[in-house]
Amino acid sequence: MYLIVTRSFPPEIGGMQSLMWSLARELSKNFMIKVFADYIENHKTFDEQASFSIERIGGPKLLRKYRKAYLIDEYLKESKVNGIIADHWKSLEHLKTNKKKYCLIHGKEINHAK
């Protein structure tokens, strides 16, 4: 099983949302997948059509990242997870686990000398 931890997931529209959806959909053909995503209005109809589990986390943005990390850490205690795939380093920063982590980096997230 793999967890996908993301701040960007449909039905919200965007490039990263499409990427994370496609990644979850394709991986779910061969692996158990559970997605932890931020709450978005009108998500229920979309989520019901997915072939994998999607858990939405709401609340104020400042507190949401801590709540999401807590829920993921609790889930990891009860489940056999091979790895965690994240859309951004901020989706991983508060997790307290030694599970393998795969982080998609893009744009200006890569700091290097010019």
Q: PLM features: what roles do these ranges have?
A:
Residues 2, 83-85, 97-111:
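Active-site proximal beta-strand in glycosyltransferases
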Residues 8-13, 19-64:
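N-terminal strand-loop element at the rim of the active site
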Residues 28, 76-78, 102-105, 109-114:
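A conserved, positively charged/aromatic
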Residues 41-46, 93-94, 113:
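Short, charged/polar "capping" segments at the starts of alpha-helices
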Residues 49-85:
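A short, charged, and often flexible helix/loop element on the N-terminal side
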Residues 62-63, 92-93, 110:
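Short glycine-rich, flexible loops that bind phosphorylated cofactors or substrates
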Residues 85-91:
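Short His-centered aromatic/hydrophobic patch
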